[in-house]
């Protein structure tokens, strides 16, 4: 890859060629691009310059580890492209110092643009429990899940929404009709709130700092999904709980219906519900007891989710946070997976990640250290399966042979193996999160496998 000065030099050379050309854009040039040059108007650029801008943005990103977390590739390229406009329009293209001038001004513009990425809060409707009564906000790091009427009250209190708009939204949620607003912007914002929350009884909000809009939004969505997965860890079968915990932007209630024909028979299409519209129902005061019991889990997972949305990743325990972040993400994907064989692969990825990718022996060491099982201990009360055999089955047949395309069991029923994987993975993840909270000064992932 060419150096920074070489790339900027090639851009300046192309601009000089464009100025000297009599027929730009010619028949073979296509429609030229424009770069905003601020007070100096805009610059006409060709495909070669666009390619050089892409190369320049990749080089700048490669040399800036913080930017790789803060920006999506598209956002970073757009920012680099925009930063080039004013200096390129202001220099003398024949000045031997032009390259250095552009380089310095681009870096200065990038720093200024990044400093403007302040605090943002992203929100989306979600399902959780069947009733919102007596449910206090659930806080897991930067994520807050609250009943939509609580969220609306908070938006008014924090002056993020006007009282008139909030009153109209409550009326709409109660089934009332709304007259059109005179102010077009207020009308659009009101419609946005109603669309984004939808019929969901809860709202999931995520606060970010130092992230640009699109990257911040994507990280907020990821953190939201992970927070729901953490909440599902409180149930014996997390995937069933998570089926009723869902962001509105994800798939909604689904009724699976298939029409089947058999020779000589009249058959009717059966149906099965998935992506349920809500989760569990709690009696009055019951969730408060559960929330108190889950507070240590939410505190530990909160540190991990803070790492997910952190602008630079420079936190006190980056190594352990990174391992646990990936484990929670794999766990979420495993619970959501519709195909049993693929779910097994993802559940085992949770175990393998917690074991730092060191395979079957270290997964056994992890379960011994955190769960307390010896190799020959039975994992079920019935005594039908030893821990070492369970791990061998999951890692060998369930994970490795499937990933490498050598499994001869994909056409068989994997529901039992999925059940086994869903027994071990959440248990290991829970115990690792507990250890993470209890050992607040530790940042060596290998210690997860030490008693």
Regions found by a protein language model. Name each.
Residues 369-382, 451:
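Short, mixed-charge aromatic SLiMs
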Residues 310, 329, 377-380, 405:
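Short glycine/proline-rich turn/loop motifs
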Residues 1-61, 65, 70-78, 93-123, ...:
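Amphipathic alpha-helical interface elements
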Residues 73-342, 416-451:
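Charged, non-catalytic interaction/linker regions at domain boundaries
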Residues 384-415:
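Histidine-centered, metal-coordinating catalytic motifs and their short helical/loop contexts
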Residues 371, 377-378, 394-398, 433:
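S-adenosyl-L-methionine
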Residues 359, 400-407, 429-438:
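Charged/polar positions within long, soluble alpha-helices
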Residues 346-347, 361-368, 412-421, 445:
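Composition- and surface-driven signal marking solvent-exposed, interaction-prone regions
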């Amino acid at each position: 890859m060419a150096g920074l000065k070489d790339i900027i030099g090639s851009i300046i050379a192309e601009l000089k060629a464009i100025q000297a050309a009599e027929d730009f854009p010619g028949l073979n040039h296509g429609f030229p691009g424009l770069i905003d040059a601020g007070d100096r108007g805009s610059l006409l650029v060709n495909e070669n310059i666009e390619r050089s801008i892409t190369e320049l943005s990749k080089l700048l990103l490669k040399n800036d580890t913080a930017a790789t977390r803060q920006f999506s590739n598209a956002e970073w390229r757009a920012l680099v492209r925009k930063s080039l406009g004013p200096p390129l329009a202001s220099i003398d293209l024949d000045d031997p110092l032009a390259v250095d001038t552009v380089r310095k001004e681009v870096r200065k513009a990038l720093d200024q643009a990044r400093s403007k990425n302040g605090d943002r809060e992203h929100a989306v409707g979600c399902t959780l429990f069947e009733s919102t009564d007596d449910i206090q906000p659930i806080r897991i790091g930067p994520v807050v899940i609250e009943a939509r009427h609580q969220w609306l009250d908070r938006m008014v209190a924090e002056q993020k929404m006007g009282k008139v708009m909030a009153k109209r939204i409550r009326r709409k949620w109660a089934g009332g009709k709304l007259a059109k607003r005179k102010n077009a912007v207020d009308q659009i914002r009101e419609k946005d709130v109603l669309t984004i929350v939808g019929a969901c009884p809860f709202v999931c909000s995520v606060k970010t700092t130092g992230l640009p809009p699109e990257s911040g939004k994507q990280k907020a969505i990821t953190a939201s999904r992970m927070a729901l997965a953490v909440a599902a860890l409180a149930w014996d079968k997390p995937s069933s709980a998570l089926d009723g915990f869902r962001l509105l932007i994800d798939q909604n209630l689904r009724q699976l219906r298939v029409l089947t024909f058999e020779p000589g028979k009249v058959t009717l299409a059966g149906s099965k519900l998935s992506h349920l519209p809500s989760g569990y129902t709690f009696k009055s005061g019951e969730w408060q007891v559960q929330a108190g019991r889950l507070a240590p889990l939410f505190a530990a997972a909160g540190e991990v989710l803070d790492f997910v949305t952190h602008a630079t990743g420079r936190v006190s325990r980056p190594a352990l946070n990174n391992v646990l972040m990936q484990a929670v993400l794999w766990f979420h994907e495993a619970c959501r997976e519709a195909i049993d064989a693929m779910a097994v692969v993802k559940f085992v990825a949770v175990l393998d990640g917690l074991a730092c990718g060191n395979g079957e022996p270290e997964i056994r060491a992890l379960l011994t250290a955190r769960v307390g099982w010896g190799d020959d201990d039975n994992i079920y009360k019935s005594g039908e399966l030893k821990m070492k055999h369970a791990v061998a089955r999951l890692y060998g047949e369930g994970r490795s042979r499937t990933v490498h395309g050598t499994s001869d069991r994909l056409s068989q029923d994997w529901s039992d193996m999925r059940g086994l994987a869903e027994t071990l993975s959440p248990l290991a993840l829970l115990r690792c999160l507990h250890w993470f909270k209890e050992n607040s000064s530790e940042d060596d992932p290998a210690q997860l496998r030490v008693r």
